[in-house]
């Protein structure tokens, strides 16, 4: 006897925007209240200061600073949003997601979203935020990607390798 499959409704939204603009801002406006609650749930003092976030970006990913600054501006120059958008010192969250790579003449990358569906943004983004290469992927945290592929065909998938 087999177990019946559970079907969960899922709605995906997609946007295409070469640089952050009104479509990203609409995503921000729709999701920021929930992200703000999550980001500040342990108190704002438990999150890094804005200067620390900026220094971390400058040290680790300086090429992202112009995009981050544009996103911050679109977020109304809200310092709390700027801190969260830096993705530095985020609150702890469960890690997961399964993936499989099938090598061969036509390699295949398969990725599963193993989190609670309520945590899934359900957004597919097509962007060129770097100004160097178009990217299509599953968006998370407003401007990060869980997985995706660039215009040259390089596919990537986020995994934590079994480590929290």
Question: Where are the predicted features?
Answer:
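N-terminal mature-domain region immediately after signal-peptide cleavage
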Residues: 1-164
């Amino acid at each position: 006897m087999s177990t019946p499959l559970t079907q969960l409704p899922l709605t995906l939204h997609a946007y295409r925007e070469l640089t952050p603009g009104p479509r990203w801002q609409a995503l921000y406006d729709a999701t920021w209240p929930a992200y703000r609650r999550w980001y500040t749930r342990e108190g704002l003092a438990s999150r890094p200061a804005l200067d620390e976030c900026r220094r971390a970006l400058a040290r680790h990913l300086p090429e992202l600073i112009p995009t981050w600054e544009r996103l911050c501006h679109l977020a109304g120059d809200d310092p709390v949003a700027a801190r969260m958008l830096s993705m530095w010192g985020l609150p702890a969250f469960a890690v997961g997601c399964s993936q499989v790579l099938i090598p061969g003449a036509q390699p295949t990358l398969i990725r599963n979203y193993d989190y609670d569906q309520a945590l899934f943004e359900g957004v597919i983004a097509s962007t060129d935020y770097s100004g160097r290469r178009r990217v299509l992927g599953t968006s998370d945290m407003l401007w990060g990607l869980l997985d995706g592929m660039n215009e040259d065909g390089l596919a990537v998938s986020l995994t934590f390798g079994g480590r929290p």
